[in-house]
Amino acid sequence: MTIVNILRVDIDQPFDYLDKQFYGNLTLRKLLVWRIFYVSKVFSQHVESLEFRKSLSGNIHVLVTINPGIQRTLVPLAQFLMGDDIMRTFMNLKRKGKGNYLFSYGNTDADRFLAERQIARKQKALNRKKSKTKNGEKNGEGKS
């Protein structure tokens, strides 16, 4: 996915499509404050920054940086604000350990599957490299 620009929106404009009696004047800022508080409270030692981006297709995503330079996850805005998927994503990133990859969390199951498969491939390659080093193959002393 190509990122073209960082989104600029009026985050204090109330949502038009929400039921005013039930939600009152709910704005993007209120939603974000609630969501960021929740995310940073649960993962306070991991979440470093949040950035809003818009793709060529017009989808809004949130780029979440966890321990800068180590792990970043791109999450669709709707999932970031409403869903629990981001929690599962963070848990996956945490379980995988420190890696130098960009976890692109797609809109569809196919995107998600491809991203997870890509991470699994990188992890497998890393494990192979570690086992070769342990067996002395790195210095040209391969098994015969």
UniProtKB/Swiss-Prot annotation:
It comes from the Viruses. Residues 134-144 have a biased composition (Basic and acidic residues). Residues 124-144 are annotated as: Disordered. Residues 124-133 have a biased composition (Basic residues). This is Uncharacterized protein ORF144.
